[in-house]
Amino acid sequence: MSRNLSIRAKVFLKPLVLFQIIDAYDRRPKGDNQVMGTLLGRTKEDHIEITNCFTVPHKEHSENKRIDLDMAYASEVLELNMFAYPNERVLGWFCTGKSVSRSASLIHDYYVRECGERQPLHLLVDASLKNQRLSTRLYCAVEMGVPGGTKGLMFSLVPLEISSENSDLVAVRCIEKQSQQQASKQMERFVPELVQVVDATRNIQQRLDLLLRYINDVLARKKKPDNLVGRSLQAALTAVPLFDSEKFRLMFNTNVRDMLMAITLSTMIKTQLEISEKLSCMQDQ
């Protein structure tokens, strides 16, 4: 993909990237005013997907407002990421703050080499949550200057759209539901996973009841049939394989057991990491 096409292509951002940036901002070392790192994702013919990122340690020089990246660390983490996600490529870099920093041009030169033929993208995230909103802006550097003279870079805004797949929407809606609960000042724990399954099943049951009422009204000639709705129902029914009730119950119970096992293992790993973090803090003191 050429660099000019990268500027014109639509850019989609996954919510996971924003969560990773916010988490890195909350865990930033004392004295650091911002965090920055590498954006990863996939490029298609007509759009770009930012699907992942990782932070890169940096050093800020207050006297000249310069920022030095740990490029060796960035290269090593990128190499490890390529083993886990071989389809992801470097798309640019992110930074927290309210405006583009003075060192953006120098950082841009580094990511030009990493992106190859693609134009590096610069995602700016204002993690200060002004007005209780997370501001995200996407920039693309454009060369400017007079012919034969000194040339510079101008960071121009690029349209950005936050997209979510069905699996992402479940987590996003759960977080949104918890954020709207202002009953207590302390953050409440998320509801257990099985309760979420029950809520999702109840929601599906309500939608099926609504669908059955519509079909019965059409058969009883109480409502006029809609061809578009009929084709949508046919596509939905043909997309789902026909299972025997006993076979479906066995498959569902197996998936529930797998989910419980995954929850148990993740809880054990989380507890182990918390203990390791506390032990490391005690050693530092």
Curated annotation (Swiss-Prot):
UniProt-annotated location(s): Cytoplasm
Gene3D superfamilies: Cytidine Deaminase, domain 2 (3.40.140.10)
GO MF term set: metallopeptidase activity; translation initiation factor activity; translation initiation factor binding
UniProt keyword Protein biosynthesis present: yes
Residues of the MPN domain: 11-145
Principal location class: cytoplasm
InterPro entries xref list: eIF3f, EIF3F/CSN6-like_C, JAMM/MPN+_dom, MPN
UniProt entry keywords in alphabetical sequence: Cytoplasm, Initiation factor, Protein biosynthesis
CDD domains on file: MPN_eIF3f (cd08064)
Cellular-component GO terms for this entry: eukaryotic 43S preinitiation complex; eukaryotic 48S preinitiation complex; eukaryotic translation initiation factor 3 complex, eIF3m
Subunit structure: Component of the eukaryotic translation initiation factor 3 (eIF-3) complex. The eIF-3 complex interacts with pix.
HAMAP family (alphabetical): eIF3f (MF_03005)
Protein family membership: Belongs to the eIF-3 subunit F family.
Name listed for the protein in its UniProt record: Eukaryotic translation initiation factor 3 subunit F-2
Gene name, Swiss-Prot/TrEMBL: eIF3f2
